[in-house]
Amino acid sequence: MQGLAQTTMAVVPGGAPPSENSVIKSQMWNKNKEKFLKGEPKVLGAIQVMIAFINFSLGIIIILNRVSERFMSVLLLAPFWGSIMFIFSGSLSIAAGVKPTKAMIISSLSVNTISSVLAVAASIIGVISVISGVFRQFRSQPAIASLDVLMTILNMLEFCIAVSVSAFGCKASCCNSSEVLVVLPSNSAVTVTAPPMILQPLPPSECQGKNVPENLYRNQPGEIV
């Protein structure tokens, strides 16, 4: 996603009780929650819900003016199915920001990913709708045609918000492969001291023995074998 993930290393004694291990895991999860909360999910979720209601209202206004057959976005009901998904994803983003449990963050990540895909589809439909009616609608119904342009812009903004929430949710729940848990053995290391070894001289090699007197390796008088 964004840059390289930072490596987090935790050292756990091998004989540590389960309570200490759970505390360490809890601390690591708290760091992940901080990553998610840095993305301001409550604020972004509120903006998602607001965009959804605006798009829904604009779609109704265009339909009530009886010119909906001229707008491709309204014919395909993009303001309605897109708005429903935006409300759902925005509500989950707010809930995950209030109670950032792992299940809530993963749910927010999944729904915002789907919402971003639908936002792309709605944006493409909106662009085609605006381009196809740039000569007809803007001359006959400039105010209504401007609403279609506004819906397209809001769909693009919704895409950016959904991708942002998904990115921070992924950093908190998925991208944790760089975290390393090091377990140390509980038993202390035992140092064993080996007895000293007596080094004896090596006999000369065969080629060196030719130049050595024969009685060099014989026992001298008074020596003990």
UniProtKB/Swiss-Prot annotation:
<keyword id="KW-0812">Transmembrane</keyword>
<feature type="topological domain" description="Cytoplasmic">
    <location>
        <begin position="95"/>
        <end position="113"/>
    </location>
</feature>
<feature type="topological domain" description="Extracellular">
    <location>
        <begin position="135"/>
        <end position="148"/>
    </location>
</feature>
<keyword id="KW-0675">Receptor</keyword>
<feature type="topological domain" description="Extracellular">
    <location>
        <begin position="64"/>
        <end position="73"/>
    </location>
</feature>
<dbReference type="InterPro" id="IPR007237">
    <property type="entry name" value="CD20-like"/>
</dbReference>
<feature type="transmembrane region" description="Helical">
    <location>
        <begin position="114"/>
        <end position="134"/>
    </location>
</feature>
<protein>
    <recommendedName>
        <fullName>Membrane-spanning 4-domains subfamily A member 4D</fullName>
    </recommendedName>
</protein>
<comment type="function">
    <text>May be involved in signal transduction as a component of a multimeric receptor complex.</text>
</comment>
<feature type="topological domain" description="Cytoplasmic">
    <location>
        <begin position="170"/>
        <end position="225"/>
    </location>
</feature>
<comment type="similarity">
    <text>Belongs to the MS4A family.</text>
</comment>
<feature type="transmembrane region" description="Helical">
    <location>
        <begin position="149"/>
        <end position="169"/>
    </location>
</feature>
<dbReference type="InterPro" id="IPR030417">
    <property type="entry name" value="MS4A"/>
</dbReference>
<keyword id="KW-0472">Membrane</keyword>
<dbReference type="Pfam" id="PF04103">
    <property type="entry name" value="CD20"/>
</dbReference>
<dbReference type="GO" id="GO:0016020">
    <property type="term" value="C:membrane"/>
</dbReference>
<feature type="topological domain" description="Cytoplasmic">
    <location>
        <begin position="1"/>
        <end position="42"/>
    </location>
</feature>
<keyword id="KW-1133">Transmembrane helix</keyword>
<feature type="transmembrane region" description="Helical">
    <location>
        <begin position="43"/>
        <end position="63"/>
    </location>
</feature>
<feature type="transmembrane region" description="Helical">
    <location>
        <begin position="74"/>
        <end position="94"/>
    </location>
</feature>
